[in-house]
Structure formats: C-alpha cells, structure tokens
C-alpha cells in the first residue's frame, strides 16, 4: 500500500459516515413512514443539509445544480376498516407517485380484484370504489398495469398488496416503487398482515365499507437540486466523479443513505489526509433517483440523467469515471461485486486482485460484472459518455426481502462491509487519479458483440452477419492494440510517479490527454450505437431483441401449423410487451406501448431511442385466446398475420445488423485517430 493510501485509511472514520447516514433520516414527507421524495420539502431540506456538510468536511466549489422535474409529496395514507369480529383496524399504507386527497376521512366501498387483471373485473362495478389487488412485481407485472386497469374501469384507487417479489421479509412489510404510469391513476400499498382480515370479509361479502384518509400530491414542472462539491485537482478539465442519490422511500438507510455517507466519508478522509489529486474529484449527491417524472416508463434516475445530459453536458469527455454507490453497508452475497461497463472490465479485474483486506463475509472474494444495468444512476452516466460502475447490490436476497420497505433500516447494518467499501473505493479513486489515460478497452465491447453472434441464424435471415463478424473482429483487434498502448502508458506513468519524476510524468500525461478525449469519444459513440433495452429494461445489443422475437415467432407458427393455439400463445407471450395483452384491456396495453414509442425524448430520459421496434399482437392474442376457449382449430387468419409479422421482424433484423456494421465503422474511425497518433 502506498503512503498516500495509508494516510487515507488512517483518516477514515466510518462512525462519522454511519452518523451521517442516520442524520439523513431527519427530513421526511410522511411523519410515520419517512419518504424523502423528488422535489418535496424533505428532499430540498436534505439537499441544503448536504451542501452544508460538504462545506464542513472541506469540499470546495460546493453548489446546488437545479433540475426541472415532477415532484411528489406523500404525507399520509391511512385505511380504517372492521374485521369479521367487529375489531377496528387502522393501517398505515405506503403510496405511489399519484394524486389523491381526501381532506380527512372519507368512506369508500372496497372490492377485491385478485391480481388486478381485466378478467378479475368481469361482473363487477368498481366505479368510485377502492379495489384491492395482490401483485408480484418481480415475477409478473409492474404496479402500473393493474393500477391503470383499475383507472380504466372507473375505480377511485387501487390498493396493492405484495404477494411476493418484494417486501418478503415480514407480512407487515409495505413496499414502494416507481409507478411507471400517470399521476391521475392513484395507488397505495397495504401490507399482507393488514390486508388479510379485510380480504376475508371481501371474499365473504363481496363489498366492504372502509374509511380512507390520504394526501399524496404530484406537481408537474417543479425543481430540485443535485448537490455538488469538489476536491480541486491540478487538472480542472479532467475529473473523477463519485455519486449517490439522496432521495428515498421510507427511511432509506441502505438505499441510499449509507451510499451518500460512503461518498462523503471518502471525501472527508481524502481532505483530512492532505491528498492532492491530479484530476479534480467531484462528489455529487443526486436528487430524484427513485422517481422524477410522471407517466414515463423510464421515470427513475432523473437527477443523474439531467446532471450529465442537461446540466453539465460538458462533463462528457472530461469525466474519466463515475463511481456510483448503492446499498453499500450490507453484504449482498458470498462475493462482493463491482458492476461496470465492458470497457473497464480488464482494469477493474486487475484492481480488485490487489485488494488484500476483503472481509470474511465475502469468502468468494470480489467479482467484476458487466455491463451496467438500468436499476441505478450509473446507467444514465454511461449512456451520456461517462464510463461508470456501481457496487453490486442486486445479487442477494435483500432486493426481495427488505428493499423499498420500512425494513430498510440500520438493523441490517454491517459495519465491516461499510468500512471495507470506504477503503476499497477510496483506493479506487486514487488508482484512477494515477493514470496517464482512461483505461478504456474498446475491444471488449466488440468481443461482447461477437460472443452473442449467430452466423447461421443471420444467414438464414439474409442478414449481413458475416460482414458484422468481420468488422467487429477488426474493431476488436484495433481496440485491443490501443488498449495495450494505454496500459503501457499507465504503467510508465505510475512508475514515474513512484520514482518522484513528476515532470516526466506530466509530459507523459500531456501526451495522452488528447488521446484520452478520443477514447472517451469512442466510448460515447459505442454507447449510442450498441446499448439498447428490451421491454423489461434489460440491456442488450440492437439486434438481440428482434432475434429473440424471430425465434418465438418461428415456434408460434410451427405450433399453429400443428393445430396448437395454446402453445402458440405461450410463444407470443415472450414477444416485446405482448404478455400484457393476455391480462389487461386494450386501453391499458396501448397506453403503456404508446408512451414508449410516441413520447417526447426528454420525457423518456435515459430510455429515449433504446427500444427500436415493436410488434403489436394484441388483436392476434385476443383471437387465439377466443379460439382456444371455443376449441376452434382453424388458424388460417392467424397464420397469415404471423407470417406478416415475421417478415416485418426479419426486415428489422437485417436493418439492425446493418446498423451495427455502420456503428462499428464509426467507432473504428475514432480509434484510428488514436492509432495514427504515435
């Protein structure tokens, strides 16, 4: 360990970070449950407190970067009802980002609607009533679908009970998520324990009178602030970013109080140790990560996306790495993990090999995973041209048990894990600061494209797969050649620094600054060309979603030719978002399709343009379902329709392969400039 790393470790005070994490619970919108939500008074006051804290620990250039968003203030939601024995239950409920105001207690009729699908409403009049639904957002569908289904049928609001997937730690657990829908379709969350006595009455009586007192307010076009502080470096135009979000559901101890505290704990120790960075270190507490815009599929990570895309677009090409933090004071598995972009995989693997103080709670050591996923702010950073990473937080059971519930508290705080992450990520900051050039391996992304290639499949579709294979091979080799030069430059740079030859190190750094800008430009171009999403927010390459669709279509056609409509439906279920055509009204399906395909890019935020194609199979699914119920085996119209869909998807696949060839050539053009600069 170098001397500066030792001084940093000696100056760490994890108790300070723990106290700060607890202090973040101070401001809340709901006096009983917590919540520190986008644009709310609680978020604004917390932002002010964090700005003061940044000043107090010695960060410089502290500022509040304003962003425009939709705000949400959830004050309370309390449900009151009698059980079968006449006992009165008064239940605290969670809420989603929607409007609902009762102005005191208001009486409603409540109705049970099973899983909240269209079929559950048959024979029911729910106009003006509260509907109770049991949902599993992990294994079935997001809250937005049953909520909008309730709205379409005229319900006053939907009350969701988590049947599984989230909040599994205890039957008293509430849950909160981004709504992914409009503010005018109200929704609340009720625990399984509180719901069960009411459900018993509803199943017996069909309808029950309940009382509700609620205040949940969404306000469009509001403001909040990302809070920024710096440790100025010798290079003002080269930066390393540390980020964490300060909005939360409930008390949000792990998600994301400890992450903000980790970030500032690292900053505090760096300042106290007297560390003088070469690059400017930027610490950014992001607002509105959990939610920040109404009626958008991509309604989270608002603060981070705006920070990179709107507020500071000039950061692109200057920030060499974003170290983002999520839920860092808990062990999420037998191995710790860092999830990063493909291009930083090699560098991170080399870095974690040097970590020799991994806690016993991680018997399998540290894994490096890639690429980044959509669940956290690092995705918004990456697609904006800032190579990013996050401590892995999705691998363990915490997501199913405690995440986004009132059980995310310090009962599950692990001081050893928290301390380890302070040491590890502080060292990582210093490692990035000791580089002549960003260690971007552009060859790795082309290797990933080749890893998922299927030349036989592309040939069967008359797509230029062989040419893509050739071009990505050339690009991979070009990227690897440049990366070898980068690694050698960084090795020499570190050696010069270790030997105290600062002037020579500076000369080497200056030689590589222009090349580093080109590396970052190539990284951004690769993100633009190759990062796409499916309808379930999984990250993939442009051609992969259509290829999957074509495989399912081929199977569906074969099933119909064999006379099995039921098996064909199983195949169609997997295509794009058509699984929702099986369970919800056409109006619901169309709303959540159109708001992806036909909405202004700014309202889609980081998801804009990431879904390239869509096949609407609602009518086809409805027809096949009806024939399955009637026992009809004449599928001639459906076969003809499916063959048209197959032809359409085939054309999309050919276009996607061609697009990737052009994208590969564009990235290569940038990389060639580096190779030619000897």
Each language-model region and where it sits:
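Catalytic-core environment of secreted peptidases
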Residues: 12-32, 38-43, 51-57, 61, ...
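Charged, amphipathic alpha-helical linkers/stalks
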Residues: 411-505
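Active-site-adjacent substrate-binding region
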Residues: 222, 328-448
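His/Asp/Glu-rich mid-to-C-terminal helical/loop segments that flank catalytic regions of hydrolases
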Residues: 279, 398-450, 569-570, 574, ...
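Acidic/histidine-rich catalytic neighborhood of metal-dependent amide-processing enzymes
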Residues: 138-145, 149, 223-226, 248-343
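Noncatalytic luminal/extracellular "stalk/propeptide" segments of secretory-pathway proteins
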Residues: 7, 12-15, 19-22, 26-130
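Extracellular/luminal Protease-associated
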Residues: 13, 38, 91-186, 364-367
């Amino acid at each position: 360990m170098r001397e500066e790393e030792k001084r940093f470790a000696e100056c760490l005070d994890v108790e300070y970070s723990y106290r700060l994490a607890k202090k973040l619970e101070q401001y809340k919108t709901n006096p009983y449950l917590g919540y520190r939500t986008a644009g709310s008074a609680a978020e604004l006051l917390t932002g002010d407190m964090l700005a003061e804290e940044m000043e107090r620990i010695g960060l410089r250039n502290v500022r509040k970067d304003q962003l425009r968003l939709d705000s949400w203030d959830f004050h309370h939601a309390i449900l009151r009802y009698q059980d079968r024995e006449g006992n009165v239950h008064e239940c605290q409920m969670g809420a989603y980002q929607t409007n609902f105001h009762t102005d005191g207690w208001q009486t409603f009729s409540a109705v049970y609607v099973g899983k909240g699908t269209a079929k559950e409403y048959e024979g029911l009049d729910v106009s003006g009533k509260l509907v109770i639904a049991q949902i599993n957002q992990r294994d079935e569908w997001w809250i937005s679908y049953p909520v909008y289904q309730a709205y379409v049928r005229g319900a006053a609001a939907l009350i969701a009970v988590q049947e599984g997937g989230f909040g599994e730690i205890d039957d008293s657990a509430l849950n909160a998520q981004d709504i992914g829908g409009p503010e005018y379709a109200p929704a609340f969350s009720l625990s399984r324990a509180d719901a069960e006595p009411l459900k018993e009455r509803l199943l017996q009586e069909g309808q029950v009178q309940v009382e509700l007192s609620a205040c949940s307010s969404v306000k469009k076009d509001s403001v909040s602030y990302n809070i920024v502080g710096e440790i100025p470096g010798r290079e003002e135009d080269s930066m390393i970013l540390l980020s964490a979000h300060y909005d939360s559901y409930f008390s949000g101890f792990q998600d994301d109080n400890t992450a903000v505290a980790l970030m500032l704990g690292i900053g505090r120790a760096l300042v106290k140790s007297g560390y003088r960075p070469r690059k400017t270190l930027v610490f950014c507490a992001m607002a509105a990560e959990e939610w920040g815009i109404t009626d958008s599929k991509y309604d989270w990570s608002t603060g981070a996306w705006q920070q990179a895309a709107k507020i500071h677009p000039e950061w692109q090409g200057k920030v060499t790495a974003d170290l983002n933090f999520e839920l860092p004071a808990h062990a999420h598995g037998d191995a710790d993990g860092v999830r990063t972009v493909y291009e930083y995989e090699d560098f991170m693997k080399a870095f974690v090999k040097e970590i020799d103080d991994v806690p016993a709670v991680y018997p399998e050591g540290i894994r490096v995973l890639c690429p980044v996923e959509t669940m956290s702010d690092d995705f918004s950073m990456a697609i904006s041209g800032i190579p990013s990473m996050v401590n892995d937080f999705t691998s363990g059971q915490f997501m199913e048990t405690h995440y986004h519930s009132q059980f995310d508290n310090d009962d599950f705080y692990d001081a050893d894990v928290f301390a380890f992450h302070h040491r590890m990520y502080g060292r990582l900051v210093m490692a990035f600061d000791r580089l002549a050039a960003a260690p971007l391996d552009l060859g790795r992304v082309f290797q990933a494209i080749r890893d998922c290639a299927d030349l036989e499949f592309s040939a069967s579709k008359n797509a230029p797969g062989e040419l893509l294979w050739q071009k990505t091979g050339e690009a991979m080799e070009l990227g690897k050649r440049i990366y070898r030069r980068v690694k050698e430059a960084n090795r020499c740079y570190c050696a010069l620094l270790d030997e105290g030859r600062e002037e020579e190190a500076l000369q080497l750094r200056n030689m590589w600054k222009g090349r580093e800008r080109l590396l970052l430009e190539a990284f951004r171009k690769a993100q633009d060309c190759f990062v796409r999403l499916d309808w379930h927010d999984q990250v993939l390459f442009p051609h992969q979603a259509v290829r999957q669709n074509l495989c399912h279509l081929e199977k569906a056609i074969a099933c119909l030719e064999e006379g099995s409509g039921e098996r064909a439906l199983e195949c169609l279920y997997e295509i794009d978002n058509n699984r929702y055509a099986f369970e919800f009204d056409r109006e619901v399906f169309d709303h959540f399709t159109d708001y992806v395909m036909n909405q202004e890019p700014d309202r889609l935020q980081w998801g804009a343009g990431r879904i390239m194609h869509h096949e609407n199979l609602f009518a086809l699914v409805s027809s096949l379902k009806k024939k399955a119920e009637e026992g009809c085996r004449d599928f001639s119209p459906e076969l003809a329709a499916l063959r048209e869909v197959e032809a359409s998807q085939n054309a999309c696949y050919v276009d996607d392969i061609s697009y990737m060839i052009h994208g590969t050539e564009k990235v290569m053009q940038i990389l060639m400039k580096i190779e030619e600069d000897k």
